């Protein structure tokens, strides 16, 4: 366990590959020596472990096990536990089927590429007027547009800030009898996106092909507009310890006791979306779920301020990403910042609670659901963006966009 943790923290090695290598050498130890004693190992044992991996795993996995076996041996040599000579992984890295031009590789590439009809459907939806699109539609089509502009991991979308667009003017070259020269007469505007690379490289500008610039600009503009109110709420919470005066908040003093309807508005529950009966019933459920009194004149904004801040996401003002090696993005800067239930048609948006979509949110909208209803053996009725817009059961994964761009580049 200590070795696995050491390699994960210090060398960023994949835990699964490290464990598979340990298991391979463990098997050889037990077969040859009847016990696990690393001091008895010889070079031939590592050859046998690599051969075992070749027999039990597919070529790409076996290669990585062999690579990890070399790392393990080098580690043992460094600590002087073993006095063996250097060892080379005998397993060759399999040819990249994305590049090789044989029939099998061609079929492999085709299976990895996105359905052309699905891409055209997404393009058609993206081209619609903004007024025709729901926030969920804007999220999906804009995210896909960005993924088609640069071969980035889909999970890195959510590290983007609202000011991710980078523009600069560059001097182009022209032909002359002396070859290509910069004569100062041609200035071209180029556009890039500041992406955050998860593998410890920080933010880096990836320039966009000129044909994609209008699409990227529109996608980012839509996302900025969609995230404007959540980002503003986060900003208000950052700059002051008072109750954040968002759009629904009643214009009353902080210490004035509130009616139930005012409490609901202050906590981001838009009562105007319901009739009187629905507002009464749904409002009670909402308040009870948050341990807020349902009677009139029980609490003021000062009281609600404490309750609201206690419900803020972990690590606020920063978004609590599960990946990204500690990337720091404030909610007030996050391009994909949203409110709770903002994408849910059956529930009202909560305008005082922050939420961030994830890679799963995007994938769920690109492929027919596999989720089952809670407590039942039947699928939920969640529709993909294709189904919502009448394009049938198209299915596509976020990783396929990256394969498409890499295939075009090759």
Question: Where are the regions a protein language model picked out?
Answer:
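Short, basic (Lys/Arg/His-rich) helix/loop patches that form interaction surfaces
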Residues: 32, 128-134, 150, 250-403, ...
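Long amphipathic alpha-helical scaffold regions
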Residues: 47-63, 168-200
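DNA breakage-rejoining catalytic core of tyrosine-based enzymes
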Residues: 95-124, 201-214
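Basic, Lys/Arg- and aromatic-enriched nucleic-acid-binding interface segment
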Residues: 117-150, 154, 400-402
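Extracellular/surface-associated beta-sandwich interaction domains
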Residues: 183-185, 189-192, 197-247, 252-253, ...
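Active-site-adjacent bridging/hinge elements
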Residues: 40-46, 115-126, 372-387
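Charge-rich, intrinsically disordered N-terminal extensions
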Residues: 1-108, 145, 159, 218, ...
